[in-house]
Amino acid sequence: MAEFEDQLVFNSISARALKAYFTAKINEMVDELVTRKCPQKKKSQAKKPELRIPVDLVKSSFVKKFGLCNYGGILISLINSLVENNFFTKDGKLDDTGKKELVLTDVEKRILNTIDKSSPLYIDISDVKVLAARLKRSATQFNFNGHTYHLENDKIEDLINQLVKDESIQLDEKSSIKDSMYVIPDELIDVLKTRLFRSPQVKDNIISRTRLYDYFTRVTKRDESSIYVILKDPRIASILSLETVKMGAFMYTKHSMLTNAISSRVDRYSKKFQESFYEDIVEFVKENERVNVSRVVECLTVPNITISSNAE
């Protein structure tokens, strides 16, 4: 750099030296920008109020144990905190009380009885949210305007028709061109949000029949969040260096471990999976299925048959 600066003389600058000087300076700045990790500005968003789970939708023995009966609704963050602070050992492993009182599948219980507590496969505090979510159950009905509506996955059309018949929602004929559009009052939206833990997607209190159908389909679908998953092939464990446990004919690993292992194969700059990883999993994941981590997890695992224990 000194040789370029020496060639810069006031009022007598060589064009070639000037070009070389600025090129070098620009290269330095670019290198600095690439190597420096600039903190991203967080979008300033108003924090949404946390939903309260109706007491009757939380496992009754859990409600009784922690004296939550008189609550107007229980924050999911409170449930998470109670689970983490009362059912785990000091080193973060699920304790014997948790095995008895929390909702575990039969497979999960068998795995816990097979492996050592020090194993990375053992249920730990990283699984708190899954265990806490299992303490709440989906509503089977909701009440509005003096009517009771039952939620059944195979009778959603009947449910929508009944809502229309009772005038709980009204057909908006002006907007109904390609699809039937309904006016849904704020009061009903509040009831659905409270009882079903999510709101329907509306705009100016208008919702299409298709979206309303999809909404009820989602909220009536059983939550099958898994702590352990079955690998399609033992070679997957070798490719991803996963800890596993064999139960009968199936090889299990923790869902969180599999997800983390796949996530680590994503290039931090291109946000795409590494080519070497593609080559390793090509037998199990088609090219059009390499969409994201969740999709790859689905392709590498066998759907679990979930049988819950300790449920009420």
From Swiss-Prot:
Induction annotation: Expressed in the late phase of the viral replicative cycle.
Protein name in the entry:
Telomere-binding protein OPG077
The entry's cellular-component GO terms read: virion component
> GO: which molecular function terms?
DNA binding
Task: List where in the cell it is found.
Answer: Virion
What does the further note read? Each virion contains approximately 670 molecules of OPG077.
What's the superkingdom here? Viruses
Query: Sorted alphabetically, which InterPro entries does this protein's record hold?
Result: Poxvirus_I1
Q: Which UniProt keywords apply?
A: DNA-binding, Virion
* Entry's family note: Belongs to the orthopoxvirus OPG077 family.
Q: According to its UniProt entry, what is the function of this protein?
A: DNA-binding protein which binds to the hairpin form of the viral telomeric sequence. Required for the production of mature virions (MV).
